[in-house]
Curated annotation (Swiss-Prot):
Residues 133-147 have a biased composition (Basic and acidic residues). This is SsrA-binding protein. Gene3D superfamilies: 2.40.280.10. GO terms for molecular function: RNA binding. The keyword Chaperone does not apply. Residues 133-159 are annotated as: Disordered. The lineage of its organism: Bacteria, Bacillati, Actinomycetota, Actinomycetes, Micromonosporales. SUPFAM superfamilies: Small protein B (SmpB). GO terms for biological process: trans-translation.
Length: 159
């Protein structure tokens, strides 16, 4: 069976972009079982409350939920098991160094298939304060209102 080309997004973590300031992003592979891959191909995954953490010089993804494969048998996987992230040693060392800085964490932003391989986009993130979140919401509302007004003006519906 030929490998599909392109990028097919399975799950996005929109809440992470709201709760954190993303400083840098990395693409990592994941060590998965067969039923996990089949469940991901069916578009079933959740990144809510997921995070990456260092253990014994390796990075692991915790809290990602991949539901059991519907047609799976006794070989089905544990939905919230810890999954190893596959990165180059230099990338792992760089990410571990960044997480040891105060206030920085690793959060998954997207899970997708890239040329047939399951990948996760990891973001180096710093937690936002409540007032930062409010500022972002106010800024987004202002931009939306300006776009709406510009659309009305271009259609000749200006009051």
């Amino acid at each position: 069976m030929p490998r599909e080309k392109g990028r097919k997004v399975v799950a996005s973590n929109r809440k992470a972009r709201h709760d954190y300031s993303i400083l840098d992003t990395y693409e990592a592979g994941m060590a998965l079982t067969g039923t996990e891959v089949k469940s991901l191909r069916a578009g079933r995954a959740s990144l809510v409350d997921a995070f990456a953490q260092e253990r014994n010089g390796e990075l692991y993804l915790h809290g990602m939920h991949i539901p059991e494969y519907v047609q799976g048998t006794w070989t089905n996987h544990e939905p919230r098991r810890t999954r190893k992230l596959l990165l180059n040693r230099t990338e792992i060392d760089r990410l571990i160094g960044k997480t040891r800085e105060s206030g920085l964490t690793l959060v998954p932003l997207q899970v997708y298939f890239s040329d047939g391989w399951a990948k996760v986009e990891i973001g180096v993130a710093k937690g936002k304060k409540a007032y930062d979140k409010r500022q972002d919401l106010a800024k987004r509302d202002a931009q939306r209102e300006m776009a709406r007004a510009a659309g009305r003006r271009s259609k000749g519906m200006d009051d």
